[in-house]
Curated annotation (Swiss-Prot):
SUPFAM superfamilies: UDP-Glycosyltransferase/glycogen phosphorylase (SSF53756). HAMAP family: Glycogen_synth. GO terms for molecular function: alpha-1,4-glucan glucosyltransferase (ADP-glucose donor) activity; alpha-1,4-glucan glucosyltransferase (UDP-glucose donor) activity. Belongs to the glycosyltransferase 1 family. Bacterial/plant glycogen synthase subfamily. Its EC number is 2.4.1.21. It catalyses: [(1->4)-alpha-D-glucosyl](n) + ADP-alpha-D-glucose = [(1->4)-alpha-D-glucosyl](n+1) + ADP + H(+). Pfam families: Glyco_transf_5, Glycos_transf_1. This is Glycogen synthase. Synthesizes alpha-1,4-glucan chains using ADP-glucose. Pathway: Glycan biosynthesis; glycogen biosynthesis. ADP-alpha-D-glucose binds at residue 12. Keywords: Glycogen biosynthesis, Glycosyltransferase, Transferase. GO terms for biological process: glycogen biosynthetic process.
């Protein structure tokens, strides 16, 4: 059972939602895969008729909840944890419409985690229980603890999509969350409790969403205070990395959001898409390169570096189109660039799926100077559409961008390193044969979920085989 706090079919706050929509489907040809997700208002609005099929009992301060079930049009079964009090509210899965975290997030996601453990134990009345729990990030991580603390033996795999989000709560909540007093230390994190740490300690296996990120988080620079624990798990062979895939809908030959389609052997559609992007962002017609930024506008994503090098890009004849939202200070910096360079820099603060896809389909380069990147999906979307990533060599960007072949990498998250990389990109743009060869290589790079799915199937079997109970996946 795939346990997750967001799923792009219904509601999405980040790349986790895309993974949750794609990975279970990539595995269904082999196993009976089902998904458990909270019953947010957006989920219920899109789910249609929900059949009540089970119920989980209250635990400490965690309320009892009904379990609903729907089946997607492609046959994927979805269990929905129903609680009007906890989940039916405005906002994203994690924050209110004002942008602040919900004060009861600990109760909300502990309830989700406990429900997963109860389903695994066969105590939810479903007439079915999974042979393995696949838990995703801190909102679901505590399920591994609830399984172990109740004497359960269901194998648990925990996937860390972003180690920076750890689900921190005060020690005073331990009793309310139903954590046994003798197990509280498993969650200890510098004077607080961490849901994610509890999952890392209790899961049978931990994986991250790229091979390089799995290595990086075992060191202090990227370990977010959990590096020693993760290094210990890695030493026992219980920490691995699998690069995410992207959905098959990202196909420039058929994409529903594109008016002008193209293929690896037929480029003309890219020019039409570029013209559309320039018009949408108020950019002048130009024969120079078009740089896209499709990102949250936050420090982690290196947006401050982009703002620093923007004058160089414009001076060299390039244009920049930015879509995204995030930290107010960076949003203001981007807005100032549009005022300083009208017709050369344009921005859309917010997000619109169709516009983002057209940017990938029309831009020449994608700017992605992330300070850290567990996997990253934008670089793979860009490659699929012939847009070459210019990326900081970190995490999944190392694993997915072949420097000088399918994009460009720079080694240090600094303005000077990014400037030197931009010079390489401009030189490539002035060599049409090289630019075409790189675009072709990028578009042909294998990045579908079939590759990642096979690796997850092997990891499921390994996790089940090495769990204490020696359970087997059906």
């Amino acid at each position: 059972m795939f346990v997750v706090s967001e799923m792009a079919d219904f509601i999405k706050a980040g790349g986790l939602g895309d993974v949750a929509a794609a990975l279970p489907r990539a595995l269904r040809h082999r196993y009976d895969v089902r998904v458990l997700i909270p019953g947010y208002r957006a989920v219920l609005e899109r789910a249609g008729k929900v059949e009540i099929v089970g119920r989980v009992l209250a635990h400490a301060a965690l309320p009892a909840c009904d379990i609903g079930r729907i089946v997607q049009s492609d046959g994927l079964p979805i269990y929905i944890l129903l609680s009007k009090e906890l989940f039916e509210r405005d906002g994203s899965p994690y924050v209110s419409t004002s942008g602040s975290e919900f004060e009861d997030n600990a109760i909300r996601f502990a309830t989700l985690s406990h429900a997963a453990a109860q389903i695994a134990a066969g105590h939810a009345g479903l007439g079915w229980k999974p042979r393995l729990l696949h838990l995703n990030d801190w909102p679901c991580a505590l399920a591994a603890g609830y399984v172990r603390w109740s004497g359960g033996t269901t194998p648990c795999l925990l996937t860390i999509h972003n180690l920076a989000y750890q689900g921190l709560v005060p020690y005073s909540m331990a009793a309310a969350l139903g954590i046994p007093a003798e197990r509280v230390a498993e969650l200890e994190f510098y004077g607080q409790m961490s849901f994610l740490r509890g999952g890392i300690v209790n899961a049978d296996h931990v994986n991250t969403v790229s091979v390089s990120y799995a290595k990086q988080i075992t060191g202090p620079a990227q370990g977010c205070g959990l590096d020693r624990l993760l290094a210990g798990r890695a030493a026992k062979g219980a920490l691995t990395g699998i690069v995410n895939g992207i959905d098959a809908s990202w196909d420039p030959r058929t994409d529903q959001y594109l008016d002008s389609h193209f293929s690896v052997n037929q480029w003309q559609g890219r020019q039409a898409n570029a013209a559309q992007v320039r018009k949408a962002f108020g950019l002048r017609e130009s024969a120079g390169p078009l740089f896209a930024v499709v990102s949250r506008l936050v420090h982690q994503k290196g947006l401050d570096l982009i703002c620093e090098v923007a004058p160089q890009i414009v001076a060299a004849g390039g244009q920049i189109a930015v879509i995204g939202g995030g930290e107010p200070e960076i949003e203001q910096q981007v807005a100032e660039l549009t005022r300083r360079y009208p017709g050369q820099v344009g921005a859309f603060i917010g997000f619109e799926e169709g516009l983002a896809r057209r940017m990938f389909a029309g831009a020449d380069f994608l700017l992605m100077p992330s300070r850290f990147e567990p996997c990253g999906l934008s670089q793979m979307y860009a490659q699929r559409f012939g847009c070459l990533p210019i990326a900081h060599a970190t995490g999944g960007l190392i694993d997915t961008v072949d420097d000088g072949v399918t994009g460009f990498l720079f080694q240090h998250a600094s303005v000077e390193a990014l400037r030197r990389c931009l010079e390489r990109a401009f030189r490539t743009f002035r060599l049409p044969s090289l630019l075409s060869a790189m675009r072709r290589a990028a578009m042909l790079r294998p990045s579908g979920w079939d590759v990642a799915g096979k690796k997850y199937l092997s990891l499921y079997e390994h996790t089940a085989a090495t769990a204490p109970a020696l359970a087997t996946v059906p």
